[in-house]
């Protein structure tokens, strides 16, 4: 088989972002064999790491992330009333917000929650900074605005209202719900007129309830400063509440809202044989993390520093358990009290944080060696010979993780911009957690096999410095990825 000379010349002259430096090219019976110049690739990536640690593209636009699980029903939600499936939607919403902001989007969250409420403090424990309003705040003006918009909507179904006019006593009950008379909206007509795809065909005529008005008022408030032409609303909800959220989305459309609306549907969270709410789940994982730490470190586990470490590790455990599965699929949790958590088993958040902490320890040891005069400072990358990185594990860490990371960070924005216009959207919220677990397995295997800080002998320094540059880039990658999960790195575990 022969390759035309112009094609061969074109391949050899390729340059640009994402194109690795080429070494030898040769013709074989199977075709053209192209070899990457590994030494030049290590130098190019490790001496210019910044672009690899941020999204491949910066975007513009506004995204409203709406979490129906946090909307007030009869009362403000609390950790004791928040189901695990609902907690999963909140964590996914938080992760999406962090990712989209880094890609350049302006992000707003909905609903705003009462300051210092139990649910706000619970979310803070998990590292979630949700928007709040004063306890005395009301949204009655916007509720009235939404009610009038629906009363005057072209989609109001007056024929059905006339056919089902209620008795006087029932009208009084309607007034208590905030609506003097039933307002019914033909949602099916909204879907048809707007030519919307992927909505439930059984969406019909919906009677507007006070709860829906509160929800619509929150949506309206959260998008006040957003230009409608560039706004996308992501409703992150459980599969059990999908139909209700489709109704709410179409009611909002019926008020005249024109923002693009997409649904991020999350599968259920199962705890076989046990009923458990979000507060109980947090308490269990925190107790298990404390037990594991005391087993390893004994009496050292006390004071504010350890409280902070256990808090972060608990959040990491919960986030990885609930985010590592494709968001449309169910999650099954092991919530037996005696099952415990391990710092070394490759099972998720604890394993990832443990390996990130190992890098912190490595560089602390190196810096102490520099202070003691054992090692010189790492020289500039142009002074190093990267051919010293001969381990296949070193190439694997560069090629499988450092090089593609920026594309991973860019994924959710790409999908929002280019993936159709149906009701549902799959934003692959599991990718960062899975990436970190896979990275931690490969890094752990490499780190257990290779002695990075060798004897302080000049002829060994070049290889040591090359490895330190590689691992410093990995440490920055860990920090960048964990930041999208609102998890700060910890110094020890």
Region annotations inferred by a language model:
Residues 1-493:
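Non-catalytic interaction-recognition regions
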């Amino acid at each position: 088989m022969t390759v035309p000379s112009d094609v061969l010349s074109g391949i050899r002259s390729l340059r640009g972002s994402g194109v690795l430096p080429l070494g030898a090219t040769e013709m074989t019976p199977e075709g053209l064999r192209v070899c990457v110049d590994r030494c030049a690739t290590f130098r190019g990536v490790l001496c210019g790491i910044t672009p690899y640690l941020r999204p491949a593209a910066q975007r513009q636009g506004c995204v409203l992330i709406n979490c129906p699980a946090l909307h007030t029903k009869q009362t403000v939600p609390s950790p004791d009333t928040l189901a695990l499936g609902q907690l999963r939607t909140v964590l996914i919403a938080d992760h999406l917000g962090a990712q989209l902001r880094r890609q350049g989007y302006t992000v707003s969250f909905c609903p705003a929650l009462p300051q210092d409420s139990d649910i706000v403090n619970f979310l803070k424990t998990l590292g979630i900074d949700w928007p709040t309003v004063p306890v005395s705040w009301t949204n009655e003006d916007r509720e009235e605005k939404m009610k009038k918009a629906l009363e005057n909507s072209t989609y109001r179904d007056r024929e059905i209202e006339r056919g089902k006019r209620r008795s006087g006593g029932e009208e009084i009950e309607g007034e208590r719900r905030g609506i003097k008379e039933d307002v019914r909206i033909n949602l099916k007509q909204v879907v048809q007129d707007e030519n919307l795809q992927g909505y439930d065909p059984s969406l019909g005529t919906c009677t507007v309830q006070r709860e829906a008005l509160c929800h619509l008022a929150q949506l309206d408030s959260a998008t006040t400063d957003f230009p409608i032409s560039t706004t996308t609303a992501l409703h992150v909800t459980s599969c059990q509440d999908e139909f209700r959220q489709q109704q709410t989305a179409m009611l909002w459309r019926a008020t005249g809202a024109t923002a693009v609306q997409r649904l991020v549907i999350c599968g259920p969270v199962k705890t076989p044989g046990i009923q458990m709410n979000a507060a109980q789940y947090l308490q269990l994982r925190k107790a298990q993390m404390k037990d594991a730490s005391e087993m390893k470190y004994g009496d050292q586990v006390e004071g504010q520093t350890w409280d902070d470490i256990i808090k972060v590790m608990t959040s990491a455990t919960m986030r990885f358990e609930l985010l590592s599965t494709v968001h449309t699929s169910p999650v099954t949790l092991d919530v037996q009290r005696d099952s415990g958590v391990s710092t070394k088993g490759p099972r998720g958040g604890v394993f990832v944080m443990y390996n990130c902490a190992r890098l912190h320890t490595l560089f602390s040891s190196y810096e102490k060696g520099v202070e003691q005069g054992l090692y010189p400072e790492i020289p500039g990358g142009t002074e190093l010979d990267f051919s010293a990185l001969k381990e296949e594990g070193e190439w694997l860490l560069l090629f499988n993780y450092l090089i593609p990371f920026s594309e991973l960070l860019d994924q959710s924005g790409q999908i929002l911009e280019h993936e159709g216009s149906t009701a549902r959207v799959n934003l692959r919220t599991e990718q960062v957690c899975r990436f970190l677990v896979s990275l931690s397995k490969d890094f752990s295997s490499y780190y257990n096999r290779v002695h990075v800080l060798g004897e302080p002998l000049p002829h060994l320094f070049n290889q040591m410095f090359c490895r330190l540059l590689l691992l410093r880039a990995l440490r920055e990658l860990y920090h960048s990825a964990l930041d999208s999960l609102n998890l700060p790195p910890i110094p020890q575990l």
